[in-house]
Amino acid sequence: MPSDDVYQTRDVQHFEHWSRSYEHSWMQRLIFNRVHRAALELATSLPPPVSVLDVGCGTGRLLRAAALRWPDARYLGVDPAQGMVAVAQRLTPGATIHRGVAESLPLPDASVDLIFSTMSSHHWRDPAAGVREIARVLRPGGHFILIDFGLPRPLAWLSLHGGGLPAATRRRLFSTAGLRIERQRTVAYPFILATLAAR
């Protein structure tokens, strides 16, 4: 269980405030909807999952879209902002939404078939720990789809956060965590990189 100071960062406070208007934000149309479509498209070649986790789930939009594709799966979400968790719980009643961070997921080992993390990893305090945690909760043969900025600092405002994860960094972090990259390509925009990996 993360300590309370994990939830006191500027990023988390920003998302607490944004949770009230997040569902209708221009960012949904400009970035998030495109990224979510790309994530689901990457997953089309995979076996239907029994369980799906979204790390940094926000208000649960990707979970709701995934549930239309795989209605029989079990859905889980994790987000550090309590406001986002509350909205996700209200709008995604079939899912179990936890308050938590990527670096300390509140889930058992080898418990999830498919894990998404979209436009979230640049907010993680420790990307290596986040990838290790994802590998820990992923079942053998399961898949992880990470979509986020693929350049260290593609936009000036990103310097307020941890920066993106370039392809070489992802290869190193994933390999160290025991994940094998199957596909990697840009999606939505040239500076957004999608990585599909297996355990």
Functional labels for PLM-detected ranges:
Residues 114-126:
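A short SAM/SAH-binding and catalytic strip from SAM-dependent methyltransferases
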Residues 103-114:
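A short acidic, Gly/Pro-enriched loop at the edge of an enzyme's catalytic core
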Residues 1-45, 61-65, 84-87, 152-157:
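Conserved class I S-adenosyl-L-methionine
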Residues 45-51:
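Short helix-loop-beta connector
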